[in-house]
């Protein structure tokens, strides 16, 4: 009989994600037109950011999850800066059914990593002489749905022999 305080077997069976370690796998920041690009600009730069999430299983319940962020800030004439960040974490899934593992890995794990990746980019852009770039929060659930729709569409597309 449970004692109502959330201890015992029911806690042991609770689903959980353990972030075992987080790390920068690869990072690049380029400031190709400094110091000329560091002066006042006539208008705000065009900022483009691409996001991708990858994961691979490294042990029975352990997964390495990567957020890949690539971006640039450009004016009509110049590139102000460019960056590429591959930020990863090693996650252990506990008591998560196999049927739920893929969305947990591709949505929840990146959601846990994102604030740290965002801060790395903000600090690098600031250190490059620009105001910090705070990337807007990313809807990893929408990104996951979009990716799954693309996979489904590719599987249904006829192949050319």
From Swiss-Prot:
InterPro entries xref list: SecB, SecB-like_sf
Domain of life: Bacteria
GO biological process, one term: protein tetramerization
Disulphide bond pairs: none
Regions crossing the membrane: none
NCBIfam families registered for this protein in UniProt: PRK05751.1-3 (NF004392), secB (TIGR00809)
Function, as annotated: One of the proteins required for the normal export of preproteins out of the cell cytoplasm. It is a molecular chaperone that binds to a subset of precursor proteins, maintaining them in a translocation-competent state. It also specifically binds to its receptor SecA.
Name the record gives this protein: Protein-export protein SecB
This protein's encoding gene: secB
């Amino acid at each position: 009989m449970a004692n109502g305080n959330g201890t015992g077997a029911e806690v042991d069976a609770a689903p959980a994600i353990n972030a075992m370690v987080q790390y920068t796998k690869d990072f690049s920041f380029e400031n190709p037109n400094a110091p000329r690009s560091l002066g006042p600009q006539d208008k705000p730069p065009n900022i483009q950011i691409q996001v991708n999430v990858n994961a691979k299983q490294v042990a029975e319940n352990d997964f390495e999850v990567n957020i890949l962020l690539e971006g640039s800030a450009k004016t009509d004439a110049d590139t102000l800066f460019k960056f590429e960040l591959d930020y990863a974490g090693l996650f252990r899934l506990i008591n998560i059914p196999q049927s739920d593992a893929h969305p947990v890995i591709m949505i929840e794990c990146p959601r846990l990593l994102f604030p740290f990746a965002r801060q790395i980019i903000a600090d690098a852009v600031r250190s490059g002489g620009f105001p910090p770039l705070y990337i807007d929060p990313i809807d990893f659930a929408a990104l996951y749905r979009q990716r799954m729709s693309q996979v489904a569409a590719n599987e249904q597309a006829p192949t050319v022999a």
